[in-house]
Amino acid sequence: MPAHPLTDSLFAHYPRPQRQDCSFYHSFDLPEGEIIGQWDLRQHADQYLGGVALNQRSVLEVGPASGFLSFHMENQGAQVTCVEPPLSYLWDAVPFADYDLEHWRQEFTAEIQKVRNSFWYVHHQ
C-alpha cells in the first residue's frame, strides 16, 4: 500500500493487530505467506466484480470485511474508500420470539471485531 499522510496517521493510531486476534473473511497472498480465509476470490475477483473496468474510478466499498476486494480494486487503478457500518445497526438476525438476540449480538460483535482486525492486519503490509 503506498504511503499517504492520512493512512500513515491511521496506522499510528491503530497498530497492526496480532494474527491470532483476526478472522480472515478473504484469502490473501502476503509477503509472510498465504492466509486462508472463508472466501477465496483470488482467481476470480474480476468476474466477481462484474468485469467492470476500474482504472481511474472512484469506488465506495461498504463493509469491506478483510479488504481483499479493496486491494484488488486499488491494484486495478481505482481510488477506493472503505466504510464499515457501525455495530449499533446490526441487521443480520431476525428477533424471533425465543431467540436469544443479546447472546447472538455479543458473539457476532466479537467475530466482526476480529474481521475488522484482519482488515488492519492486511493493510499494514
What are the functions of these language-model segments?
Residues T7-L10, L41-A45, V122:
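Generic structural signal of hydrophobic/aromatic residues within well-ordered alpha-helices
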Residues S23-D40, E111:
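Short, compositionally biased strand/turn segments
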